[in-house]
Amino acid sequence: MPSPLNDPALEALLERLHKESNAQVDDTRAYFDRRVQEGTRARNTPYDDAAHRFLSDKMVALDRDKAQFCYLLCRALRARRVVEAGTSFGISTLYLAAAVRDNQVDNGVVIGTEYEPQKAAIARANFQAPA
């Protein structure tokens, strides 16, 4: 699917971030599969402390098509205020911010929340990246 963003600098940044995120998917899946096989975690159960520690430095990002859908949904709704729970490294937040920007509304705002301080710091750096 072609990108709806029409912003080459942002698209380049997101391309890099999506590649980094995709590189972690197999390791993350293997970690949870191994935990299930070991009997230390049942399928479809809430995350325990070990899982939280494992994920604390991982990108937990929407796939590109889902992030683009969120962008298009915010555009269609002419969203001016968006709250995201679980910003992680800020990939989906960049899509949400682009939608609010492209809606050309006064006083638009995107609020991202993140539990892990190091992820929040990386997200802030991604928001400041030239895009």
Question: Where do the language-model regions lie?
Answer:
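A short alpha-helical cap/connector motif
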Residues: 1-131
